[in-house]
Amino acid sequence: MSITVEEFKKEISLGIPSELPELPQYDESVNHAPKRKEILSDSEKKLAVRNALRYFDPKDHKFLAKEFSEELEKYGRIYMYRLMPRYKITARSIEDFPHKSKQAAAIMLMLSNNLDHAVAQHPHELITYGGNGAVFQNWAQYRLTMKYLSEMTDEQTLVLYSGHPMGIYPSHKDAPRVVVTNGMMIPNYSKPDDWERFNALGVTQYGQMTAGSFMYIGPQGIVHGTTITVMNAIRMIQNSENENRSKLFVTSGLGGMSGAQPKASVIAGCVGVVAEINPKAVKTRYSQKWVDEVFEDLDLLIPRIKKAVENKEAVSIAYQGNIVDLWERLAADNIKVDIGSDQTSLHNPWAGGYYPVGISFEESQKMMAEEPERFKEEVQKTLRRHVAAVNKLADNGMYFFDYGNAFLLESSRAGADIMKNEKEFKYPSYVQDIMGPMCFDYGFGPFRWVCSSSRPEDLDKTDSIAAEILEEMVKDAPSEIKQQINDNLKWIKEAKKNNLVVGSQARILYADAEGRIKIAEAFNKAIKDGEISAPVILGRDHHDVSGTDSPYRETSNIYDGSRFTADMAIQNVIGDSFRGATWVSIHNGGGVGWGEVMNGGFGMVLDGSDDSDRRLKSMLFWDVNNGISRRSWARNEGAIFAIKRAMDANPNLKVTIPNLVDDEILNNL
């Protein structure tokens, strides 16, 4: 429904209206979340409805109680579809949002982007990506949060408990405008079924990473990381044989995050073949031109792959079907696959993150809700077949890596032949081999920004500024980080040509602390000078140097025994909050799954002021060097180099450096 800006502002200021809107018709054309596992007892179902009714006037309780009970029965959750706005949710210009605080308006823009139909995976269920990465639990929370943000000042802070707006509280100008927590659980109650139960009760949510922290920028965010990963994987195997052919990269997933893989394959210059079982996801990526070609028949796909490889094409091909069928056919036909991975949502294996082979998409969705134990058994059977086919191709020279989606972990739990020994997997995580030692240890990670004007010309200006900064930095950069800077310089120069924007006018760029600070300073000056027309919002993925403690992904290249600890992520969000972040977040889960990860992020609004300049220098320096310090203490060579360099540059930084012990001393014990 199209409305004027003034009508939009009025809608936001209403919050939860006293006269409730009509219940909308269920829209089958939208990609919906599957029905969630039925896990609540009869008394717990009543508690879930009681909890939901807290948002509403008692005069509406009788009919809403029946409606919410039916929603819970039909979908496994209470989404409050009745309150879903009729206006289009999108990253409008910052001035279109009603506000007393420009910082709060920027947050409204960012959370709106996460719910844009062009961006979100299941927009009507408030899921941005990953099958269960939620912005809010229900539409009442959305409406109330937007109302609070429109009313608050720079002397207040909004507190969000797993999507629930607890309230706005007195604070001060240097405090965050919003503090977000998602899925914070007593450690003993952080198993997957605990998420199912407590989310169904309406008391917690899984925010993934940038979903619940309002920092998702569409698949562009993961395109860059995937491009870097694939490029470096190609470099790792390049010397093994000098073939006059394209490299073949095979993987799965065309969802919110995994949908980046085909675009990244083309940018990296290889043949990318991506399997996806959900036809709506395939259609979305094909219509966005993130996939070049689509096949449903393996008999047609295999010859096309051979031709693309032989012709040295850089092309992305989607296989609409189950990834295991594809792997088994490639293995049976003895096709040489150079690089393999997986981006199914195995952090969420029993609720739509992974589909069993030999069972249709529709049958699987029905089974996961009605026969969850049988569904789990079928998934684990499929994982065993999946790994067997991968092993056969790996024996033939394929380099396979886990893309941080819990593939190795869930395969091991399924009893697949995935272990090298009792403690180690056969295959590395991409962080162990590539992202950790080449990027995170040196402080390089997914820095990003959004132009709050929503004008493409402002984004063009930021691209130009960032390129100029990197061109200067690379001249004097030490050899250890020249390649990282050059890769990102190439990326930013080609970003517009690669047509990466989906949703907000955003850009991602892997940079270290020095690069982030210099780029942010230059943006702030350009805003002050009127070269950029409106504030710029800085952020990053939680998947970064310091933001995430995740033993099977971000911290998988930590070998001092501390990879199962979470001090780094907690220290990071606390440190960001008092160094100038506009909003901060800390989440349970993200990437590998609920109970497996602790991760956090931030947002920072640059408005051209001296205050912004002061905050960005303090916060961005900490936000990167916290993680380098931890990685250095774990004896990671690149991190020791990076933190010593940081101390040389800033005399106020003093970090404890590890003393390295001679192996012979320990061997003689």
Regions found by a protein language model. Give the residues of each.
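Short, charged/polar "capping" segments at the starts of alpha-helices
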Residues: 281-283, 410, 546
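Core active-site phosphate/anionic-ligand binding loop and the adjoining beta-turn-alpha structural block
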Residues: 299-519
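Intrinsically disordered, low-complexity regulatory segments
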Residues: 657, 661-669
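Structural alpha-beta junctions
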Residues: 151-156, 269, 336-339, 392-399, ...
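General beta-strand structural signal in soluble alpha/beta enzymes
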Residues: 157-162, 180, 251, 274-275, ...
